[in-house]
A protein has these predicted regions:
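A positively charged, amphipathic N-terminal helix/segment that binds anionic biomolecules
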Residues: 2-3, 57-68
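A detector for short, charged/polar N-terminal pre-domain segments
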Residues: 1-11
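A basic, amphipathic helix-loop patch mediating RNA/tRNA/ribosome contacts
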Residues: 9-54
Length: 68
């Protein structure tokens, strides 16, 4: 599992998807979250502005990342 270091207290889910280049743009990030394509700590989550903190794990399209 790869790790991603965040700056500050948290990063929003759609910002993380864009920062990792898992999606091409913000609209696509919002769409994949709304369609239930993203897992947060092992469960599908539909919150686009979900605040991710160190220790959280995000999965999308066979990729997995842990925030540190």
């Amino acid at each position: 599992m790869q790790e991603f270091k965040i700056e500050g207290e948290y990063i929003q889910l759609i910002q993380l998807l864009k920062a990792l280049n898992w999606v091409e743009h913000g609209a696509m990030a919002q769409w994949v979250v709304a369609e239930g394509c993203v897992k947060y700590n092992g469960q599908v989550d539909y919150r686009k502005r979900l605040k991710l903190r160190p220790g959280d794990v995000v999965e999308f399209d066979g990729m997995q990342i842990k925030l540190v």
